[in-house]
């Protein structure tokens, strides 16, 4: 299975206009059986996206984040049980670098993953290093620690957990990491998971656009893309979808 996941972040879009631009420009792309195209709007727009995309033959709905807590006195948070009330939500991003900077630890990301699996929602677990970590030569150790908490997770093998490798220092800059650097990290992640007999699809995220996506997707161990800024334009996102 291949994956193309849009993270709209804290942006509010004209959903009808976005869907129209996407579907008018996507041409012949793979079906849902081989390519899952998942759109993650902000929480308030999720119901509207579900409604407007109901008749789309390509688009699925996801969430940008979830709480590690069960429903209760946690102001401003959304639980996995709340997400599961929308049967159309099949995926949820956790551990995005912007959430990690806001305080999500590896332990919290693991807890969020568990909550999602309990509700049969597939977690898209983000891992990745900062520019400082990359330049210090500590990238592999840093990635290992992010993956370490999942090593004894018995449900990992029987549930659809997706890993998204994001080069934090490239996010939002318009400049993607060099292919050789992406390859090294993806191969390391795959090898690390393999030592635990864990198989997971691995995506790449970090200033992905229609121009660079084809070259990135040519890498054998990359099963898809997590797209930020370029996903806000339905036409641009359609061009990325055509590269699968």
Regions found by a protein language model. Give the residues of each.
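Active-site loop-to-helix "anion-binding N-cap" substructures in soluble metabolic enzymes
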Residues: 1-244
């Amino acid at each position: 299975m291949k994956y193309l996941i849009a993270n709209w972040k804290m942006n509010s879009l004209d959903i009808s206009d976005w869907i129209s631009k996407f579907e008018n420009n996507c041409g012949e792309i793979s079906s849902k059986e081989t390519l899952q195209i998942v759109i993650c709007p902000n929480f308030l727009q999720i119901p509207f996206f579900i409604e407007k995309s109901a008749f789309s033959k390509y688009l699925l709905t996801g969430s940008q984040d979830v709480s590690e807590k069960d429903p209760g006195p946690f102001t401003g948070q959304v639980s996995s049980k709340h997400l599961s009330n929308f049967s159309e939500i099949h995926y949820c991003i956790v551990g995005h670098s912007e959430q990690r900077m806001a305080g999500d630890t590896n332990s919290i990301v693991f807890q969020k993953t568990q909550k999602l699996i309990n509700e049969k929602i597939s977690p898209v677990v983000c891992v990745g290093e900062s520019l400082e970590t990359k330049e210090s030569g500590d990238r592999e150790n840093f990635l290992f620690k992010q993956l370490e908490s999942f090593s004894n997770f018995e449900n990992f093998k029987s549930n659809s957990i997706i890993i998204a490798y994001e080069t934090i220092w490239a996010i939002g800059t318009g400049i993607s990491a060099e292919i050789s650097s992406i390859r090294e990290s993806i191969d390391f992640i795959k090898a690390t998971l393999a030592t635990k007999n864990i198989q997971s699809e691995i995506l790449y995220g970090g200033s992905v656009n229609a121009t660079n996506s084809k070259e990135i997707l040519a890498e054998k161990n990359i099963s898809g893309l997590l797209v930020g800024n370029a996903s806000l334009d339905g036409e641009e996102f359609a061009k990325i979808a055509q590269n699968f």
